[in-house]
């Protein structure tokens, strides 16, 4: 069971209560705080599209605390971030691992942040398959293509050579916030709120 806090605001027309995520959305904050799957991606994408419709010229903040997850769901979020007009500011609060680190690096250049005690981890895609040898081969070839695509985009977003990305993602590669800044995944470690 997931508990979602409710906040109450006083207005000149009385009280209004919101779940906390709806209240954050009013401030153009989208919170990705769980594993990335199709459901999570649909929710994040819907919020990004809604905020673009509300004001296409105002930045959207994507707060990330996620262990990563599905590559295809992550690509759906990534493509939407690139598609919409507003800049998407990314901020790691806690952990951005795997696909979540990929999304962190995909924020607007100069607007990718992490809090001081955040942890970022990149690695190659994970997959599992059982079945006939031909099917296993098809899936293995697919995951290798996905790895190449992820590595290419991560190299573009970080400024690292593709060979370094491939070597570093061979196994789990952990970074603290300062390391992630030096690597090019983020642009700045935030101590105080920039908003």
UniProtKB/Swiss-Prot annotation:
PROSITE patterns: CLP_PROTEASE_HIS (PS00382), CLP_PROTEASE_SER (PS00381). It comes from Thermoanaerobacter pseudethanolicus (strain ATCC 33223 / 39E) (Clostridium thermohydrosulfuricum). The gene is clpP. Keywords: Cytoplasm, Hydrolase, Protease, Serine protease. It catalyses: Hydrolysis of proteins to small peptides in the presence of ATP and magnesium. alpha-casein is the usual test substrate. In the absence of ATP, only oligopeptides shorter than five residues are hydrolyzed (such as succinyl-Leu-Tyr-|-NHMec, and Leu-Tyr-Leu-|-Tyr-Trp, in which cleavage of the -Tyr-|-Leu- and -Tyr-|-Trp bonds also occurs). The keyword Hydrolase applies. The lineage of its organism: Bacteria, Bacillati, Bacillota, Clostridia, Thermoanaerobacterales. Fourteen ClpP subunits assemble into 2 heptameric rings which stack back to back to give a disk-like structure with a central cavity, resembling the structure of eukaryotic proteasomes. CDD domains: S14_ClpP_2. Cleaves peptides in various proteins in a process that requires ATP hydrolysis. Has a chymotrypsin-like activity. Plays a major role in the degradation of misfolded proteins. This is ATP-dependent Clp protease proteolytic subunit. One of its GO terms (biological process) is protein quality control for misfolded or incompletely synthesized proteins.
